């Protein structure tokens, strides 16, 4: 039987998880899975249905009619919500807040769990999120908890949003990020925290290449791949 590797990268919003995980997946020829996009897609469905993200009953009622698919175009993950590519629509601050709210609903996490795990059964994967090493893939071959200061993380997110043409100030992004940090850490269902055996990597003040270099060194040391 062929050995399949699973690498879990967790951390708060804006820590660079997706960018770093995507780069490492490309280098290693692994599949990259962005689980945060799944929560954002469910949050988007709730927003479109005019259901509050923290309305557990209302959001849960939407789940039976939600169909999510992942496709890969030139190595980039795209997420489809009931057949519609919503990869761009889910990258707003509103979608981020909704994602944090719906991710605190146990029924939503249960709804997504097997879908998330299914990708690691037959593939080498790098999966990022907030509870990959603690809940989704507790048996992952390597668990990394990636973090940075809230100011660093907000600056990265702000620049990303400016590149997408979004009209938002740094102060607005920082405030939204600090609210999300509080929500993610305080929720009862799978709160944001490092797995006991996770390697902690702080990228405060690092360039993207420096951060990728640190993660690459950890993977090489631990897995020799």
Regions found by a protein language model. Name each.
Residues 9:
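Hydrophobic anchor at the beta1->P-loop junction of P-loop NTPases
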Residues 71, 116-123, 132-135, 139, ...:
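Small-molecule kinase domains that catalyze NTP-dependent phosphoryl transfer to phosphate-bearing small molecules
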Residues 87-164:
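ATP-dependent NMP and nucleoside kinases share a basic, alpha-helical "lid"
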Residues 20:
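Hydrophobic positions on the alpha1 helix immediately C-terminal to the Walker A/P-loop
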Residues 12:
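P-loop (Walker A) phosphate-binding loop of NTP-binding proteins
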Residues 1-6:
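Extreme N-terminal, non-catalytic leader segments
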Residues 17:
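Conserved lysine of the Walker
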Residues 26-91:
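N-terminal phosphate/diphosphate-binding loop that engages ATP/GTP or pyrophosphate donors
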